C-alpha cells in the first residue's frame, strides 16, 4: 500500500505503528519522527496536487480541520481520500485501531491504545481555559479535542458551553478565575511575554487566589492526535501532580 499523509500527527502515528514503509509522501510540517526522508508535497493547506499524483498513492490521509475540501476533491480524482476528525480521546482510540487494521499493524495499535488507557487517569479536579489565538483572542470551546484531552485527567473547561473556538476578550475570560491557563505555542506562537501578561491579568481579576499560567509549551502536545496523545496525557498528569 502506498499512502500520502497530509496530516503531521498521522504521519507520526503511522511510523509509530511500524507502517512507515507504506508512507511515500508527507507535508512540509511533518516533523516527527525526526529526520524523515520521504518526499515533501507542500503544506497542509498548500499541497502540490501534481506531486501527490506523481507519487501514485493508493490512499491519501487528510484532516477535516487541517486540510481544505477543494484539495481533497482534487486528490479524490486519482486516489482514495480518508478524512479524519477526532474530537475526543475515544475518537483517537478508534483512529489508531482503524490505522492498525488498514496497515496490518493491529497488535501495535492495541499497544498504543493501552498506553492511552494507562495514562488516562482523572486526578485532582481543576478549572482551565486554553487560548489558541491572539488578535483577536480565541479559546478552545467544549466540543474540541483540546478540551476533551484536558478533561480526561480531571480538568473542567470554563468555556465548555461554547462551541469550537469562540472569540472572547481576555479580561472577560480571565474574570472567570480559572485555576490554570494553558498556553500552547501553536497554532498561535505565544511567547513568554504573553504568559506574563496573562498572569498579571489573572492576578488582578482574582488577587486573593490567582490561578497559574502554564506555558508556552510545545503545542503539539495538545493539538496533535494519535500517538502524540500519549505524550499529551503524560504532560497533563505531570501538571496535575503539582496542583
Label every model-predicted segment.
Residues 1-243:
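N-terminal ligand-binding lobe of clamshell/alpha-beta domains
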Amino acid at each position: 500500500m502506498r499512502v500520502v499523509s497530509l496530516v503531521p500527527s498521522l504521519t507520526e502515528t503511522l511510523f509509530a505503528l511500524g507502517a512507515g514503509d507504506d508512507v511515500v509522501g508527507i507535508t512540509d510540517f511533518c516533523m516527527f519522527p525526526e529526520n524523515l526522508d520521504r518526499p515533501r508535497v507542500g503544506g497542509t493547506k498548500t499541497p502540490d496536487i501534481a506531486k501527490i499524483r506523481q507519487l501514485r498513492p493508493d490512499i491519501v490521509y487528510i484532516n477535516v480541520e487541517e486540510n481544505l475540501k477543494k484539495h481533497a476533491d482534487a486528490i479524490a480524482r486519482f486516489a482514495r481520500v480518508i478524512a479524519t476528525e477526532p474530537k475526543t480521546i475515544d475518537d483517537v482510540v478508534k483512529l489508531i485501531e482503524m490505522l492498525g487494521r488498514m496497515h496490518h499493524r493491529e497488535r501495535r495499535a492495541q499497544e498504543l491504545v493501552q498506553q492511552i488507557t494507562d495514562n488516562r487517569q482523572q486526578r485532582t479536579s481543576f478549572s482551565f481555559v486554553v487560548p489558541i489565538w491572539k488578535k483577536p483572542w480565541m479559546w478552545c470551546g467544549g466540543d474540541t479535542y483540546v478540551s476533551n484531552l484536558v478533561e480526561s485527567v480531571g480538568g473542567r473547561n470554563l468555556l465548555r458551553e461554547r462551541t469550537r473556538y469562540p472569540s472572547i476578550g481576555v479580561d472577560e475570560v480571565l474574570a472567570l478565575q480559572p485555576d490554570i491557563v494553558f498556553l500552547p505555542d501553536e497554532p498561535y506562537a505565544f511567547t513568554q511575554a504573553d504568559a506574563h501578561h496573562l498572569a498579571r491579568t489573572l492576578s488582578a481579576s482574582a488577587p486573593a487566589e490567582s490561578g497559574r499560567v502554564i506555558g508556552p509549551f510545545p503545542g503539539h502536545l495538545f493539538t496533535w492526535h494519535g500517538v502524540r496523545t500519549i505524550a499529551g496525557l503524560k504532560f497533563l498528569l505531570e501538571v496535575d501532580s503539582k496542583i
